[in-house]
């Protein structure tokens, strides 16, 4: 593309290409709504990020014809999706909540033998594998154009339209966009939300023994992990000790993991090198083990936040721009996908003259309530595991240590059942009182 300024018109412009933005582009593309999507990143997610696709989201993917493709991605079909707890990965196993591998999940769900009865089972897959599928599907619609490597520098909301300016990374190309609606899908630090003056309300970085305050994420490759630590594979691996609490999700079932640990007060994340990141992992293992660090960064756990507003006249926010979770229960990414499904058909109907302003307003009414509900559940899960503190001598090879480990394992497995077996939470959101629902007598 030649250097210069290009003026483009679109019914909808989406700022951000994560799960919410890409899913919304698909929902609009299915309804032939002209849509431009821009994201400052050069492509879809590299780091693992979200690691669980709930059953409702899998049902949406089934409707789009991609459920089987998604289920074939990520970990091998026979890889255990257990939740396992250890003092350290190479030391004592405290307990394990067994869950079916993806090859057995749907058959089990459809047998009506367990707690899940649905057309699709949950699937343990990293967001990094889901996003490319969503991008490809969105780009298949003639009415949708996806642009990665473009940063929004400004936007202005008018009475009947919204304008926005995007600059391409490392070029002199600018797009001046005129759209009927602008969607803020630009994540936790949303420029769109901030310019609208909307506030995130709730708990910021709530401190806990684990899953509260500063955490550190390490994306690593360690194919010999289970051989070295001498344990059976699991999807989610937790350590429970007073020195290096951590969780680690299997990413591909072949040796890539997403490792997260609570930083101690004496640890300065600014000084963490690749080698120190590897040491954090080794401390959680409790044995000497080699690994390749692919990336590492700090993040804050303990958020339970929902924006006070989701919509203005011509600008709408969703996904992480509208709500922030501590990633317990796998609710954040899945809530974002549901935001997109809810908003997509409503935007299309209004743009086609089949609905009025009230239909758009129902998006805020419905999805804000669900966000408050879901962040509350996630906070409860984080409290349950994060405020459960290891007893002294838990790691001791003594009779007392064995008793302490038995009690801890019992508690943690019961916690896992509450956090990772949640059909009621997955399917139980309600839109009572929504303006699009017929009123009934109390």
PLM regions and their residue ranges:
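Beta1/beta-strand and adjacent pyrophosphate-binding region of the FAD-binding site
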Residues: 4-20
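Glycine-rich FAD pyrophosphate-binding loop
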Residues: 29-49
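Conserved beta-strand-loop-beta-strand element in the redox core of flavoprotein oxidoreductases
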Residues: 156-176
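Core beta-strand elements of the Rossmann-like FAD/NAD(P) dinucleotide-binding domain
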Residues: 8-10, 171-181, 185, 312
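Conserved mid-domain beta->alpha element of the FAD-binding
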Residues: 16-25, 134, 184, 293-380
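Active-site-adjacent segment of FAD-dependent monooxygenases/related oxidoreductases
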Residues: 46-137, 240, 375
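A conserved short coil-to-beta-strand element within the FAD-binding core of flavoproteins
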Residues: 148-163, 298
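Conserved FAD-binding catalytic core of PHBH/FMO-like flavoproteins
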Residues: 136, 181, 185-299
């Amino acid at each position: 593309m030649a250097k210069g300024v290009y003026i483009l018109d679109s019914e909808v412009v989406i700022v951000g290409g994560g799960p919410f933005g890409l899913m919304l582009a698909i929902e609009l593309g299915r309804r032939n709504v002209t849509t431009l999507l821009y994201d400052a990143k050069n492509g879809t997610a590299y780091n693992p990020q979200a690691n669980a696709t709930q059953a409702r989201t899998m049902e949406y993917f089934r409707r789009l014809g991609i459920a089987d493709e998604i289920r074939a991605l990520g970990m091998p079909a026979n890889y255990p999706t257990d939740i396992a707890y250890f003092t350290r990965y190479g030391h004592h196993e405290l307990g394990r909540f067994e869950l079916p591998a993806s090859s057995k999940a749907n058959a089990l769900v459809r047998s009506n033998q367990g707690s899940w009865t649905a057309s699709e089972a949950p699937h343990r897959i990293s967001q990094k594998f889901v996003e490319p599928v969503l991008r490809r599907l969105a780009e298949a619609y003639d009415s949708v154009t996806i642009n990665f490597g473009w940063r929004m520098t400004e936007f202005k909301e008018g009475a009947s339209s919204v304008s926005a300016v995007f600059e391409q990374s490392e070029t002199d190309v600018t797009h001046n966009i005129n759209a009927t609606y602008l969607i803020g899908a630009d994540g936790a630090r949303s420029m769109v939300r901030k310019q609208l003056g909307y506030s995130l309300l709730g708990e910021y970085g709530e401190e806990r023994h684990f899953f509260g305050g500063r955490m550190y994420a390490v994306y690593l490759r360690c194919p010999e992990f289970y051989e070295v630590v001498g344990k059976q594979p699991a999807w989610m691996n937790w350590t429970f000790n007073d020195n290096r609490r951590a969780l680690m999700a299997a990413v591909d079932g072949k040796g890539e993991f997403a490792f997260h640990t609570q930083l101690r007060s004496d640890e300065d994340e600014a000084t963490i090198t690749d080698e120190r990141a590897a040491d954090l992992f080794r401390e959680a293992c409790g044995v000497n083990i080699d690994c390749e660090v692919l990336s590492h960064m700090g993040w804050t756990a303990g958020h339970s936040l929902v924006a006070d507003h989701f919509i203005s006249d011509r600008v709408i926010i969703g996904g992480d721009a509208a709500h922030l979770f501590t990633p317990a229960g796998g609710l954040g990414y899945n809530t974002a996908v549901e935001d997109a499904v809810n908003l997509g058909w409503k935007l299309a109907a209004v743009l086609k003259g089949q609905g009025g302003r009230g239909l758009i307003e129902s998006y805020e009414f419905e999805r804000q309530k669900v966000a408050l509900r879901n962040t509350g559940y996630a906070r409860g899960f984080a409290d349950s595991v994060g405020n459960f503190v290891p007893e002294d001598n838990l790691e001791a090879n003594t009779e007392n240590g064995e008793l302490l480990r038995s009690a801890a394992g019992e508690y943690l497995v019961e916690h896992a059942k509450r956090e990772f077996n949640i059909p009621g939470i997955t399917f139980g959101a309600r839109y009572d009182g929504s303006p699009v629902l017929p009123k009934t007598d109390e």
